[in-house]
């Protein structure tokens, strides 16, 4: 793994996606003591402290964030602006990575006062290390910045770089929303199996195994999948 292994990180927001990334980074060797998390919700702060001993969990913006070389924005879109304005003074000079949906990089640059910004659109399989993430970097993000971001998102699965920020909207529809369609079809297959006489556990195992196997087959082929 690259530079983030030795770069202090700050997470603004400590929900499921942040937890998945933090867990992946620690598993890859980043010392927990190099991670700060700002999380306003007290029960979630307690959960993070229990889950990740050594990680510094803060209630709000603090001068402690000034050590961060990379700030990961994992807040809800409606709270992003206020959080950014509160934290901007403590994160001057840092690289910023946002996993918040729908917040354009122009707005982020205005609130944070920097051009070193990368937007990411992950999906829910990232929670188990099998995600697919679309990435867009503003021109002010260097090759080194992009490499740091790649090292971080690699802990949650695969990624693709996009040339246009607007393509993140397409990524949201395709891979961001895609798992919901897979689960819907999976449920339909399971229910069909039960309807035809299989017990629920067997139908579930067959349906999931079919999806896993078909996905592996598609990934191993250079040809586009066809019915």
Protein language model features and the residues they cover:
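Short pre-catalytic strand/loop immediately N-terminal to key active-site residues, enriched for Gly-Thr
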Residues: 9, 117, 167-173, 226-227
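NAD(P)+-binding Rossmann beta1-loop-alpha1 motif at the extreme N-terminus of oxidoreductases
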Residues: 1-60, 111, 131, 194-195
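Aromatic-residue-lined binding/catalytic grooves and analogous aromatic/hydrophobic interfacial grooves
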Residues: 178
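Internal alpha-helical scaffold of NAD(P)-dependent oxidoreductase catalytic cores
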Residues: 107-116, 132-170, 183-220
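Phosphate- and divalent-cation-binding pockets in alpha/beta enzyme and binding domains
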Residues: 20, 47, 82-83, 107, ...
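Rossmann-like NAD(P)(H) cofactor-binding subdomain of soluble oxidoreductases
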Residues: 42, 52, 61-135, 139
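Short acidic capping loops at alpha-helix termini that bridge into adjacent secondary structure
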Residues: 32-35, 93-94, 116, 201
């Amino acid at each position: 793994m690259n530079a983030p292994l030795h770069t202090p990180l700050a997470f603004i927001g400590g929900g499921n996606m942040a937890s998945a990334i933090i867990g992946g980074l620690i598993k890859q060797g980043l010392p927990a003591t190099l991670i700060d998390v700002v999380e306003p919700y007290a029960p979630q702060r307690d959960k993070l402290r229990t889950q990740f001993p050594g990680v510094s969990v803060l209630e709000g913006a603090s001068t402690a964030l000034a050590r961060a070389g990379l700030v990961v924005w994992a807040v809800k879109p409606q709270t992003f602006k206020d959080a950014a304005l509160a934290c901007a003074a403590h994160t001057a000079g840092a690289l910023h990575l946002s996993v918040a949906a729908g917040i354009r990089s122009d707005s982020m640059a205005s609130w944070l006062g920097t051009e070193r910004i990368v937007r990411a659109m992950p999906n829910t399989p990232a929670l188990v290390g099998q995600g697919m993430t679309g990435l867009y970097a503003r021109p002010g993000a260097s090759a080194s910045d992009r490499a740091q971001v790649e090292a971080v998102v690699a802990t949650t699965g695969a990624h693709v770089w996009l040339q246009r920020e607007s393509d993140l909207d397409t990524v949201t529809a395709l891979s961001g929303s895609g798992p919901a369609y897979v689960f819907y079809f999976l449920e339909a297959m399971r229910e069909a199996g039960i309807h035809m006489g299989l017990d629920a556990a067997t139908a579930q195992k067959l349906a999931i195994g079919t999806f896993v196997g078909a996905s592996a087959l598609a990934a191993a082929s250079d040809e586009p999948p066809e019915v």
